[in-house]
């Protein structure tokens, strides 16, 4: 744990530095980011349902029947959807590097290391957000999660916008193609994510 904390501090200071580190730190960063994000989402949904929608249910007894119950399947769905979101960011950058830039050296291992350093700030933010979500500080938790998502997408943009040294495509067309390919990957994953959590997002619509 101490080694990971040292790695995280280094990633926060220099997120774009090309440093070969123990791959377990990259896996730990993605695991923590997924767990913190899923926890924030789950507790935000729980408190929103118990608070605002609980009051509405006191007026209309059938109101709560319109929304899904929170159970073990809910936890699993939210965790899988969150994992898919961050994996889509990783895969988007990987596909662009391998098939647009034709960079055979860009492996999933390398993509994981590059992305994990860029996602150090979201790891920290979602960790704080999960704490606030646990204790019903929903608006601050949602704000931190939205900032985290924005930074995650910015990290994805940073990765795909940097051409490989051996890229033979004109820089403008290369960037256009990278956006299209990356967008296609993210969209396919987005459909799967929405299939898993759309009903829970409805609970947050009027929070």
Regions found by a protein language model. Name each.
Residues 43-59, 192-202:
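Membrane-helix interface motif
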Residues 1-37:
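N-terminal juxtamembrane cytosolic/stromal segments of multi-pass membrane proteins
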Residues 130-207:
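Terminal transmembrane helical module of multi-pass membrane proteins
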Residues 46-53, 103-105, 127-137:
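Transmembrane helix-loop junctions in multi-pass membrane proteins
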Residues 65-131:
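Alpha-helical transmembrane segments with an aromatic anchor "belt"
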Residues 36-41, 85-89, 121, 125, ...:
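Alpha-helical transmembrane segments of multipass membrane proteins
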